[in-house]
Amino acid sequence: MTDIPPAVSPPPGPEIIDALAAVIASRQGADPATSYTAKLFGRGRGKIVQKFGEEAFEVGVAALVESPEQVVAESADVLYHLMVLWADVGVTPDRVWAELARRFGTSGIDEKAARKK
């Protein structure tokens, strides 16, 4: 999924998102021969979107017919590819967290209705 040596991986928890975002950002513009992430960026947004869609589908399939462990593995792939997509369009995790915070405590039905106005 990423090119981070295990020795420098942050501990499990929310801070891993910021660490992964920093690694992903560092791969933008890098030589595609040096990392999978750089290769994805080099292939363009269409390929990034395609990979995200494939991984989202795979987590759905895993939820239907595979083990919880496979759902976890596929979910990590979805998050990684989503974060590559965010980076490609210039969105940081903080912006997504802010939007989630804005919506928190609002009914999903009410939030969706407000978007139609």
From Swiss-Prot:
**Compartments in which it is found:** Cytoplasm
Coiled coil ranges (UniProt) are none
This protein's source sits in the domain of life called: Bacteria
SUPFAM superfamilies associated with the record: all-alpha NTP pyrophosphatases
Listed under GO biological process in this entry are: L-histidine biosynthetic process
Question: Is Nucleotide-binding one of the keywords?
Answer: yes
Catalysed reaction, written as an equation: 1-(5-phospho-beta-D-ribosyl)-ATP + H2O = 1-(5-phospho-beta-D-ribosyl)-5'-AMP + diphosphate + H(+)
The alphabetical list of record keywords is:
Amino-acid biosynthesis, ATP-binding, Cytoplasm, Histidine biosynthesis, Hydrolase, Nucleotide-binding
Q: What is its main location?
A: cytoplasm
What does the entry list under GO cellular component? cytoplasm
The entry lists its GO molecular-function terms as: ATP binding; phosphoribosyl-ATP diphosphatase activity
What Enzyme Commission number(s) does the record list for this chain? 3.6.1.31
The record's annotation in HAMAP family points to: HisE
Protein name from the UniProt record: Phosphoribosyl-ATP pyrophosphatase
Per the UniProt record, the source organism is Rhodospirillum rubrum (strain ATCC 11170 / ATH 1.1.1 / DSM 467 / LMG 4362 / NCIMB 8255 / S1)
Originating gene: hisE
